[in-house]
Amino acid sequence: MQVVSRRLVQRPLVGGASIYSSSSLRSLYGVSNHLNGTDNCRYSSSLATKGVGHLARKGTGGRSSVSGIVATVFGATGFLGRYLVQQLAKMGSQVLVPFRGSEDSPRHLKLMGDLGQVVPMKFDPRDEDSIKAVMAKANVVINLIGREYETRNFSFEDANHHIAEKLALVAKEHGGIMRYIQVSCLGASVSSPSRMLRAKAAAEEAVLNALPEATIMRPATMIGTEDRILNPWSMFVKKYGFLPLIGGGTTKFQPVYVVDVAAAIVAALKDDGSSMGKTYELGGPDVFTTHELAEIMYDMIREWPRYVKLPFPIAKAMAAPRDFMVNKVPFPLPSPQIFNLDQINALTTDTLVSDNALKFQDLDLVPHKLKGYPVEFLIQYRKGGPNFGSTVSEKIPTDFYP
């Protein structure tokens, strides 16, 4: 048997050209060419650190192609994360997935790319060295980390502000990060009645102070298979037979399909750098009141609409005990579903896209209407199966069940 060995040699750049000359990505900072070359693999932001040559854009655009993007996606195991990882992997990007929980938490993401394309990496968001390790080989960083409620270990400020600030500072020190995207929330403001939205606003300011050319995405309430609005509503209705309308159901907002938000993030990476340093407000095409969105939910799960109008003071009183006890008991409390005090505070004001804000259209995208496919996942709550339900006129046949 003849053994053939091959030595992989990194070829120097010709004429001092940047390794990203064929890519639409542009560096956030003026990094000299020698930092992007083979002299210093720490800043090469490519697979050259493993001796397999520089990443180059090639292929037809599928997941077996190479897009030139090596993205570290913080918060990839969450709701939006799975859709973003899927779209990045689909276009041939390598995706590094930091996670801090069980090793099973990112397992479903590995199926979204070719072998070795989606790489889970254990990390600690409070450990700077851990953050540097998961960011070391990336040229794109996307931060999706956020939390709608407090826990014993992470306050609103920890999850939504301090971690985002630390990630931005590490990315700045890295020197080879070409695009940085911070995912915030529509309605983020220092004057918001919601602590989470105030923390998100502080995070935006901290990120832009560290990386002035970072892109800020402000999605509205996201709708999708794993969402945290229509699913809890449906489960509450199936369990108790009615839905509480907090504040009478008159609050206006613009829910958006989660796949559209992921597409907007990818579109910002694909552009010529025109999205750098800008803030986008990503709301759906239609404005709903809480009551109108609940009607869509009832229609989809085929149940008779039954409501109990709950004034804000009563709703806050019902939600307050968890917030009071969260740091006073020696065990974790259940996650709040409908009665989340901070979300109730947020519902006291309308959350709509500003008239002069950059929107989906500025990224050449048209968001889906929240009818049909985007809410089709709710058929799982229909009584008797997907073809039945309480509002269906024909009765379920007696021989339907075995």
UniProtKB/Swiss-Prot annotation:
Compartmental location:
Mitochondrion matrix
Where this protein primarily resides, as one coarse class? mitochondrion
Co-factor note (free text): Binds 1 FAD per subunit.
Swiss-Prot/TrEMBL keywords: Electron transport, FAD, Flavoprotein, Mitochondrion, Respiratory chain, Transit peptide, Transport
Mention any one GO cellular component term assigned to this protein in its UniProt record: mitochondrial matrix
- Extent of the transit peptide: 1-43
Q: Pfam families, per this entry?
A: Epimerase
Q: Which domain of life is it from?
A: Eukaryota
Known cofactor(s): FAD
Job description of the protein? Accessory subunit of the mitochondrial membrane respiratory chain NADH dehydrogenase (Complex I), that is believed not to be involved in catalysis. Complex I functions in the transfer of electrons from NADH to the respiratory chain. The immediate electron acceptor for the enzyme is believed to be ubiquinone.
Family, similarity comment: Belongs to the complex I NDUFA9 subunit family.
Q: How does it assemble?
A: Complex I is composed of at least 49 different subunits. This a component of the hydrophobic protein fraction.
Write the protein's name.
Answer: NADH dehydrogenase [ubiquinone] 1 alpha subcomplex subunit 9, mitochondrial
The source organism is: Arabidopsis thaliana
Q: Which lineage is the organism of this entry classified under, starting from the top rank?
A: Eukaryota, Viridiplantae, Streptophyta, Embryophyta, Tracheophyta
